[in-house]
Amino acid sequence: MTSKADFTEEEWKTILEGPPSAGLVVILSDRGGSVRETFSMARAYTEARRQHGESELLDDVVAEKPEMDRARAGSPEELKQHNLDNVRQAIAVLKTKATEEEVDEYRRFVLGLAERVAEARKEGFLGLSGERVSDAERAAITEIEQALA
């Protein structure tokens, strides 16, 4: 099994940036999101172990405080692209040392986190009679899926 010990400090930092970067892509997709979406990202970390079976790698990821890349981009679109790049880099690092099964578990974890963030608030006027996930959030999740490929 692959664990934190198998990666350099820089590689591990990149792996830790992947999940919150995916969550931020979803938050940015719909005019900045909400506090509820931000909290849903934190909740996803605590629920991850129950949903993804045994994985020392995910145990190590979940055990650490989520890392956020503090880079500042000019526009929301640039920030979104920067965070999608973080997701791509994280999966690329994992592919070099983790098993295929562990890479797939990480993908499912990141995608599950993004989906929880998207479902955190109901769309529509005052949250009434709206959808749980907006079209913009669905598009963001599709982009995250592509980045994880």
For each predicted feature, which ranges?
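Small-residue-enriched hydrophobic alpha-helices in membranes
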Residues: 1-149
